[in-house]
């Protein structure tokens, strides 16, 4: 299972990747990465809730 810290680092990396795609004006890559960002953010949210609830 991925830890909170690992998922946070994944999200940060994806955001950097999105920034690079934005600089290249690559809309297809931007869309693909934005989906990955949304999925990672959702995982991070769940890990945060689990942490708060002591799981």
Region spans (language model):
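Short, charge-rich amphipathic interface segments used for partner binding and complex assembly
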Residues: 3-55
């Amino acid at each position: 299972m991925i830890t909170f810290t690992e998922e946070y680092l994944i999200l940060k990396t994806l955001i950097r990747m999105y920034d690079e795609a934005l600089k290249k004006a690559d809309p297809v890559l931007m869309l693909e990465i934005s989906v990955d960002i949304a999925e990672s953010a959702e995982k991070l949210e769940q890990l945060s809730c689990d942490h708060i609830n002591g799981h």
